[in-house]
Amino acid sequence: MYKADITMYDCPVEALSNILGKKWVGQIIWGIQDKKMRFGELQRALDGCSKKMLMQQLDLLIDNNIIINDKKTVNNIVESTYYLSESGLLLLPFMDKMINWSNSYLLC
């Protein structure tokens, strides 16, 4: 059994599709890639994504060990920096292949 979000799946492809298919998730993962980003930077990069939606999707990605939230306290203020975990980095070549396939076979 494979757990994605709060649902259990028999098929690993279905479990991963459940996560990657959620609104903004692909753009969040692809947008971070090889850099660390603060919440505000992510929100500005995702034009049209509400603060609430971004928080929900980041929580989903953190819970599924795709993104890491590095929290540091600076002058009594907690600063969160988000970046891809090892497993998140391993998704990038897969997502690149999905982009190439989509560009070749899906009508836009």
Residue ranges and their predicted role:
Residues 11-53, 72-82:
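N-terminal helix-turn-helix DNA-binding core of bacterial DNA-binding proteins
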Residues 8, 30, 86-108:
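Amphipathic alpha-helical dimerization/coiled-coil segments
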Residues 68, 79-87, 92:
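A basic, often C-terminal nucleic-acid-binding module that engages the phosphate backbone, implemented
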Residues 1-2:
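Long, low-complexity, charged/polar intrinsically disordered regions in eukaryotic proteins
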Residues 62-72:
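A short, conserved structural fragment
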Residues 54, 58-61:
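Basic amphipathic alpha-helical segments that dock to polyanions
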